[in-house]
C-alpha cells in the first residue's frame, strides 16, 4: 500500500511536466481517481489521498495542436462501435513486484475542453482502442495514473473497460428543521399623563340685594250674588206596546216506517234476518271496546300497559 501511494504521488508530480504527452489536446479534465472494486484482487482504498489531475496549458510557441496519434489502431475483435478518444494507458513493465501491473480501469468522465492561447486549429482525437466484446460507446476518457516510461519497449495492453457499476443513490433523510416561533414582542403601552388644567375660580361678585318696601294693598270683598235655580219640567214619553203575533204550529202527520217488525222496546220480537238481541248486544259491546282501545292508543297516544 505504501508503495502504491508513493507511486501515485510521483505520478502526480510527473503529470505536470509531461502534460503534452498525456493527450492534453483533448481538453484538460479535472478528474478524481477512485478505484472500482475488482473480482480477483482486493479493492483499492484511497482513504488518505484524493488526487486531482490538472493539465498545464501548452506553451505559447505551439501554433497547432497535433491530433491524438499516440498508438496505432489494432485489429478490433468483435467490436461494433468505435470509441472516441480513449487513449490507451501505458503500463510500466514490472521488474520486481507483480502488484504494480494492474490494469487501470477507466471510468467514463466528461471532460471540458480548455481554451488555450494562440491555438488556430484543434483536431479531434481519432485513436480508437480495441475492446473485447463491448457494445457501449464511452466518451473521451483520460488515464488516471500515468507512470514514467523507461527506455524499454512498452507493451501496450488492451484496456479492458468494465461496465460502470452504478452505485445506489443514497437518499439522505430529510431533516425537518423545527419551526422557530419568534416571540411576539408586546410593546409597552405608554400612558400619557393626563394634564389637568387648573380650574380658575372666578370670584363671585355678590350684588347687594335691594329690599323693596312691601306695599300692602287693601283687600276688597266682593258681594256674593246667588243665582236662582231653574227646574226643568220632566216630559214623560208614552210607552208603545207591540202586539205579540203567535205563529200557528203545523203538526206533521206521522207515517209508520215499512219495517215489518213490531214496535221497538223491551219484549219486541226481532225482524227476519236479524240475530237475537243477546248476541247482538255482545257483538256491539265488543265493537265498542275495540273502538275505545283504538281511540285511547292511536288518537290519545296512551301506552299499551295503561289500556
Curated annotation (Swiss-Prot):
Region (Disordered): 56-257
GO biological process, one term: puparial adhesion
Subcellular localization(s) per the UniProt record: Secreted
Post-translational modification: O-glycosylated by Pgnat9 in salivary glands.
Tissue specificity remark: Specifically expressed in the salivary gland.
Highest taxon of source: Eukaryota
GO MF annotations, alphabetized: bioadhesive activity
Keywords in alphabetical order: Glycoprotein, Repeat, Secreted, Signal
Signal peptide as annotated in the record: 1-23
One GO cellular component, as annotated: extracellular region
Protein's name in the database: Salivary glue protein Sgs-3
Biological source species: Drosophila melanogaster (Fruit fly)
Gene: Sgs3
Amino acid at each position: 500500500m505504501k508503495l502504491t501511494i508513493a507511486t501515485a504521488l510521483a505520478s502526480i508530480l510527473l503529470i505536470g511536466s509531461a502534460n503534452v504527452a498525456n493527450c492534453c489536446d483533448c481538453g484538460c479534465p479535472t478528474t478524481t481517481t477512485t478505484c472500482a472494486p475488482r473480482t480477483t484482487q482486493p479493492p483499492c482504498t484511497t482513504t488518505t489521498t484524493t488526487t486531482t489531475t490538472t493539465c498545464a496549458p501548452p506553451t505559447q510557441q505551439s501554433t497547432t495542436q497535433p491530433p491524438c496519434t499516440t498508438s496505432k489502431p489494432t485489429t478490433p475483435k468483435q467490436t461494433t462501435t468505435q470509441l472516441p478518444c480513449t487513449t490507451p494507458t501505458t503500463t510500466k513493465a514490472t521488474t520486481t513486484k507483480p502488484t504494480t501491473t494492474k490494469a487501470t480501469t477507466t471510468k467514463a468522465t466528461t471532460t471540458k475542453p480548455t481554451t488555450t492561447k494562440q491555438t488556430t486549429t484543434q483536431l479531434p482525437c481519432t485513436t480508437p482502442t480495441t475492446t473485447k466484446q463491448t457494445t457501449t460507446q464511452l466518451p473521451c476518457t483520460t488515464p488516471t495514473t500515468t507512470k514514467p516510461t523507461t527506455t524499454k519497449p512498452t507493451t501496450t495492453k488492451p484496456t479492458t473497460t468494465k461496465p460502470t457499476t452504478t452505485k445506489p443513490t443514497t437518499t439522505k433523510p430529510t431533516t425537518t428543521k423545527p419551526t422557530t416561533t419568534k416571540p411576539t414582542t408586546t410593546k409597552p403601552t405608554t400612558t400619557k399623563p393626563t394634564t389637568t388644567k387648573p380650574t380658575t375660580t372666578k370670584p363671585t361678585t355678590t350684588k347687594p340685594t335691594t329690599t323693596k318696601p312691601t306695599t300692602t294693598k287693601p283687600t276688597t270683598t266682593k258681594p256674593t250674588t246667588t243665582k236662582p235655580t231653574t227646574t226643568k219640567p220632566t216630559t214623560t214619553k208614552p210607552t208603545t206596546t207591540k202586539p205579540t203575533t203567535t205563529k200557528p204550529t203545523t203538526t206533521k202527520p206521522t207515517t209508520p216506517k215499512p219495517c215489518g217488525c213490531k214496535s221497538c222496546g223491551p219484549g219486541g220480537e226481532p225482524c227476519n234476518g236479524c240475530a237475537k238481541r243477546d248476541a247482538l248486544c255482545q257483538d256491539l259491546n265488543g265493537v265498542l271496546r275495540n273502538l275505545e282501545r283504538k281511540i285511547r292508543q292511536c288518537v290519545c297516544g296512551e301506552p299499551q300497559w295503561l289500556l
